[in-house]
């Protein structure tokens, strides 16, 4: 284990002898606490020889990254105090949880959130015991960790979170530690390009710190095994100014880190000062690249630094074996127990903590105070800073629907006008952004460009449109980065919306999972304040991807979403423009949810006027009386639909049934809020059994046309009384490049198949049903012949509309 003698302050050594002694002691204290959390149940100050009874029965956690994380934390504390910075720490190597907990305990913020974990020997014992222990805290930098917005259990998102946090926070610096293992992930690799979207005149700064300790779980890391020149060129090519801090001797490393951080902060301030005095690009188009070279620090230090050099004759420090728990089997290997005690005593806890277990006052004075402490920074508990969006009245954007099924509109285009004016009303507040992977115009939201542009700080050409350093629409062709930016933006107290093609939102399936888990836990932590919901607007959906083909056809994101906690997720399938307006308003006003809205962008028939849309959207489910004819009697069949195209095909099927079997009593039920189908005991939006039975009856056939995979509806309704009579049509992985209507035919969701389903399941149709089915089969044959001859749908399909009253 390396120990440095104090260095003399020179021009290249910014720390005085006393400053170096103190900062090294502070680092040793954090390392001691990190080891204690992994191993100890008792004897926190080692006031007696270590025995097996002091050791946890199950040793969990990760040591390897902790000393580097704590080294960084101690030095960030120094520059926060020196420059009076508003800064917090995003920890990419989330398995370094012990380090982040240790440092927030040392600075005092942890004990303010958890008074039982006091800043003394009793609190230290509890701190150690709770780590990775039943009833305690997780091993990663979870929501329970003060100052965290990035758990880091699943790697790759730290840097996009950091940039999301920095947008529109001009006085904030986000120090983002990126693990060299994490740097190999796709999302992190793309995140380096975020510097082309950060406007130094308006936004805060991100200080990336690449933690190059050389190893993952059992392999070397790529960036640690390329040459210094290649590594420097890589990050210079990304547009950063890299600074290196390299070594293993703590004394010189402290001096080097202090000097580099001083330079980095001065560079950030110079970049911002120049941009804020003259603007970025001066608002003019430039053919030269003009974004600044932000500083980036590459910290090359040993994995498991200051830990045992060897265990059982095998290398440990500066090798992958230090990744997790360096010393195991302490009960059966006394030499391991002795090695652990020697390791912990090497930090000289008697120099760090007084008799009562309190951090020595001269060391405690190194930490910032109040909200300047990174564990107490309000940006890391964004609900503290959350302000309501200024919202126009969505009813002002209503589509006029004098009668159902005759007017044609593009639902997302109408919502784009609403989003445009939300953006306009909140320009001064700078707290609303729209994210998308190069799809804002494609998804018909381009009204936004009436009031803002795409954020862009890189090169501009004369022919470019809607690019500006001041833009508030964020577009990069990486769903991962869009989601990461938005999460960072929301977690620090702002609002936003993510618009994406339905099939390709699957790219962020696991990011959705992680954010849902974060929200679930955050809701259970009293000091975590509610944040704005994460809102997805999924369009260009499965039923209108006939032109792009099978690869673009997948509605399965909904299935993933409904697996998560009912307290977190909401799924909406508005059938038309007015309902979409209502749902969008509702979602943007909500807190601590993940809202998924699936809506069409193509021209489509409109069903509800605004008053009806509000009533229907508010209930989430309801009978469409104007499309039903069972008002005077029990229905013979319930025709249910969820989604814009299933609604269209259901109503077209109802029209056919009413023309060919007018005596049939039909009830049409439309579902906007998918979770109403679950029992109320399972989801707060769910219908009671009584209400569900009232809508769907207890014994009549239900023909359900659903936007996505049909088995999901069976999952949601399996406990309902009438589930045995439920027949669901939806997407069943049939698709290609074809016509819009043929997509529904390939999946048996079209009007003709729905009519045949009714004929098969309503006993009173008897022989008439056979003739009806034959007629529908003939129509399907006509359809196939027509599209293969003409390349488009039949006129009776293209031109169909809901019959006017009396027709």
Curated annotation (Swiss-Prot):
Example GO biological process: carbohydrate metabolic process
GO molecular function: aldehyde-lyase activity
PROSITE patterns, A to Z: PHOSPHOKETOLASE_1, PHOSPHOKETOLASE_2
Name this polypeptide is given: Probable phosphoketolase
First-tier enzyme category under EC: lyase
Highest taxon, organism lineage: Bacteria
Organism from which the protein derives: Nitrosospira multiformis (strain ATCC 25196 / NCIMB 11849 / C 71)
Entry similarity comment: Belongs to the XFP family.
NCBIfam families cross-referenced by the UniProt entry: PRK05261.1-1 (NF003616), PRK05261.1-2 (NF003617), PRK05261.1-4 (NF003619), PRK05261.1-6 (NF003621)
Entry-linked SUPFAM superfamilies: Thiamin diphosphate-binding fold (THDP-binding) (SSF52518)
Keyword Lyase among UniProt keywords: yes
């Amino acid at each position: 284990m390396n120990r440095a003698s104090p260095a003399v302050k020179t021009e290249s050594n910014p720390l005085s002898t006393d400053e170096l002694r103190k900062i090294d002691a502070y680092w040793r204290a954090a390392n001691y606490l990190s080891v204690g959390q992994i191993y100890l149940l008792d004897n926190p100050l080692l006031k007696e020889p270590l025995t097996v009874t002091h050791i946890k029965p199950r040793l969990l956690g990760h040591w390897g990254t902790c000393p580097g994380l704590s080294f960084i934390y101690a030095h960030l504390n120094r520059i926060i105090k020196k420059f009076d910075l508003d800064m917090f720490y995003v920890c990419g190597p989330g398995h370094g949880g012990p380090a982040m907990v240790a440092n927030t305990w040392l600075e005092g913020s942890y004990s303010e959130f958890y008074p039982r974990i006091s800043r003394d020997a009793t609190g230290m014992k509890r701190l150690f015991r709770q780590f990775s222990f039943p009833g305690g805290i997780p091993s990663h930098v979870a929501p329970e960790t003060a100052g965290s917005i990035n758990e880091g259990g699943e790697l790759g998102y730290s840097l996009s979170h950091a940039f999301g946090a920095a947008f529109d926070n001009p006085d904030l610096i986000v120090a983002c530690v990126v693990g060299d293992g994490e740097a190999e992930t796709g999302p992190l690799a793309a995140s380096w390009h975020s510097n082309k979207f950060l406007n130094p005149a308006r936004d805060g700064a991100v200080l990336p710190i690449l933690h190059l300790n050389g190893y993952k779980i059992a392999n070397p890391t790529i960036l640690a095994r390329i040459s210094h020149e290649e590594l420097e060129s890589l990050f210079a090519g990304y547009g950063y100014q890299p600074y290196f801090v390299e070594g293993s001797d703590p004394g010189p490393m402290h001096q080097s880190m202090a000097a580099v951080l001083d330079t980095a902060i001065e560079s950030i301030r110079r970049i911002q000062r120049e941009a804020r005095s003259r603007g970025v690009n001066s608002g003019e188009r430039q053919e030269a690249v003009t974004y600044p070279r932000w500083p980036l620090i590459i910290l090359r230090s040993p994995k498991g630094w200051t830990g045992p050099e060897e265990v059982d004759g095998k290398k440990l420090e500066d090798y992958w074996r230090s990744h997790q728990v360096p010393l195991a089997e302490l009960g059966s290997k006394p030499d391991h127990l002795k090695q652990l005690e020697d390791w912990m005593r090497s930090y000289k806890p008697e120099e760090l903590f007084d008799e009562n277990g309190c951090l020595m006052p001269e060391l405690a004075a190194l930490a910032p105070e109040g909200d300047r402490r990174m564990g107490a920074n309000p940006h890391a508990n964004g609900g503290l800073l959350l302000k309501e969006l200024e919202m126009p009245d969505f009813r002002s954007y209503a589509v006029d629907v004098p009668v159902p099924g005759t007017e044609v509109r593009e639902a997302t285009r109408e919502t784009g006008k609403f989003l445009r004016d939300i953006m306009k009303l909140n320009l001064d507040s700078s707290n609303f952004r729209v994210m998308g992977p190069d799809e804002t115009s494609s998804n018909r939201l381009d009204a936004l460009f009436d009031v803002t542009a795409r954020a862009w700080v890189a090169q501009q050409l004369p022919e470019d449109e809607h690019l500006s350093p001041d833009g508030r629409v964020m577009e990069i062709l990486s769903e991962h980065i869009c989601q990461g930016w938005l999460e960072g933006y929301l977690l620090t107290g702002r609002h936003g919306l993510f618009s994406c093609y339905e099939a390709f939102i699957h790219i962020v399936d696991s990011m959705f999972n992680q954010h849902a888990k974060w929200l679930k836990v955050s809701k259970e932590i009293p000091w975590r304040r509610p944040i704005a919901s994460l809102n997805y607007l999924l369009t260009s959906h499965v039923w209108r991807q006939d032109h792009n083909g099978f690869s673009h056809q997948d509605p399965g994101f909904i299935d993933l979403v409904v697996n998560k906690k009912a307290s977190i997720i909401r799924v909406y399938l508005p059938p038309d423009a007015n309902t979409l307006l209502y749902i969008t308003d509702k979602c943007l006003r909500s807190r601590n949810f993940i809202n998924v809205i699936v809506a069409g962008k193509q021209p489509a028939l409109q069903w509800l006027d605004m008053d009806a849309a509000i009533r229907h959207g508010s209930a989430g489910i309801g009978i469409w009386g104007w499309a039903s004819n069972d008002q005077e009697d029990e229905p013979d069949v319930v025709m249910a639909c969820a989604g814009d195209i299933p609604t269209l095909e259901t109503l077209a099927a109802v029209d056919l049934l009413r023309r060919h079997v007018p005596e049939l009593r039909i009830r049409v039920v439309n579902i906007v809020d998918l979770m109403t189908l679950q029992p109320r005991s399972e989801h707060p939006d769910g219908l009671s059994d009584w209400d569900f039975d009232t809508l769907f009856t207890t014994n009549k056939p239900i023909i359900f046309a659903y936007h996505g995979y049909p088995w999901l509806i069976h999952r949601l309704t399996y406990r309902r009384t009438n589930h045995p009579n439920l027949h669901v049509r939806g997407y069943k992985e049939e698709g290609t490049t074809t016509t819009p209507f043929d997509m529904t035919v390939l999946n048996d969701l079209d009007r003709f198949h729905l009519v045949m389903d009714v004929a098969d399941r309503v006993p009173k149709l008897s022989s008439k049903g056979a003739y009806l089915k034959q007629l529908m089969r003939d129509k399907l044959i006509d359809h196939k012949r027509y599209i293969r001859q003409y390349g488009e749908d039949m006129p009776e399909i293209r031109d169909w509309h809901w019959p006017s009253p009396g027709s």
